[in-house]
A protein has these predicted regions:
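Structural signature of the two symmetry-related core transmembrane helices
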Residues: 15-29, 210-225
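Intracellular juxtamembrane helix-capping segments at the cytosolic ends
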Residues: 53-67, 248-261
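Helix-to-loop junctions at the C-terminal end of transmembrane segments
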Residues: 1-12, 96, 195-207, 291
Length: 321
């Protein structure tokens, strides 16, 4: 994260994204060529490093573009990411059914990505390069940025619970038939994507603070319904609410962090992302640990409390308005 932030602020997100995006798909293709565990481990390492650079750069682009439009649009960009996830899954399914090898699949994606970057990099926002050459390499997040990071941490923990444990929850707690085990995850993803495409209009009408306050309550309500009524219909509705609740949080946090007046957007986004991704990494193992001591319903109840914490933190935040 600090390296990505330094590169974005020194050279600008446009330059970094134009370089990182083609390298990202090269790293992806290298995964398909891995012939040993060491090769795979190194490939995954570079895939993560370059992917993080692209992530910070593209989110900085989103923040800078939103500033130019002077209205909420960043949530829709994240909606496009959600749609790309669905598209990637469908393409992967098609490739499997056609018996195409992973490296061939990845090479097709690499070619399409290169074409995309070649024709569209000129439309990226130039942004501003950081002129402060004495800025320290690592800046500890504090104050409003730390608060934003904790809000994002809670939201990412809820996302991680859905990504990694929704299938297990539907199988072991809801006791859904095998054909419906993926229903919870699918309903969550659909509502998260839908929420992101309508989120900007909601933020414009209701305000960012009220929208984020409501999102925390919606996350908690969704988790509560899933825990208290562990049947297929209620759990599906609950997971849909969680998807709707988390849909606007991360884009909103990035937008607010990128508008701070003390440090460049790239560094601010890296700070917030460093804290938030801990939620994505720590949330699922925490759920597994608690469920091993008791059961998965208690784990989901705890994640539901994170939603209320989001509402409290947003209410107390002076940076969010």
């Amino acid at each position: 994260m600090p390296v990505s932030a330094k590169l974005v602020t020194k050279y600008g997100s446009k330059k970094l994204l134009t370089i990182a995006a083609p390298l990202y798909v090269i790293a992806l293709t290298n995964l398909g060529l891995a012939g040993s565990s060491w090769h795979l481990a190194l490939s995954l390492f570079f895939f993560g490093v370059i992917g993080n650079m692209a992530n910070i750069a593209v989110n900085t682009q989103g923040v800078d573009t939103e500033k130019l439009y002077d209205r909420p649009i960043n949530t829709s960009f994240h909606g496009a990411w959600s749609i790309a996830g669905f598209a990637g899954a469908l393409v992967g399914l098609l490739m499997i059914n056609l018996h195409i090898q992973p490296y061939q699949h990845f090479m097709v994606i690499m070619l399409l990505s290169w074409i995309n970057v070649f024709f569209n990099h000129q439309h990226l926002v130039s942004g501003q390069e950081d002129k402060d050459t004495k800025r320290p390499f690592f800046i500890k997040p504090e104050g409003s940025l730390l608060q934003l990071g904790i809000i994002a941490f809670c939201s990412m923990a809820a996302e991680g619970a859905m990504f990694d444990w929704s299938g297990v929850y539907f199988k072991d707690v809801v006791l859904a038939p095998q054909s419906l085990v993926v229903l919870g995850y699918a309903s969550f993803m659909v509502m998260m994507a839908a929420g992101r495409f309508i989120g900007d209009k909601v933020i414009l009408k209701a305000g960012r603070k009220r929208t984020m306050q409501a999102s925390g309550i919606i996350i908690s309500a969704g988790m509560a319904i899933s825990v208290l009524f562990p049947n297929i219909v209620a759990a599906t509705i609950g997971f849909m609410l969680v998807g709707l609740g988390v849909s606007t949080n991360i884009p909103s946090v990035y937008s607010v962090a990128g508008r701070n007046e003390k440090i460049p957007p790239g560094i601010a986004l890296a700070m917030v992302s460093s804290v938030s991704y801990l939620g994505f990494l720590m949330g699922p193992p925490l759920i597994g640990y608690i469920s091993a001591l008791s059961n998965l319903r208690y784990s989901y109840a705890l994640i539901g409390c994170f939603g209320l914490l989001i509402t409290v933190l947003v209410t107390r935040s002076k940076a969010i308005n």
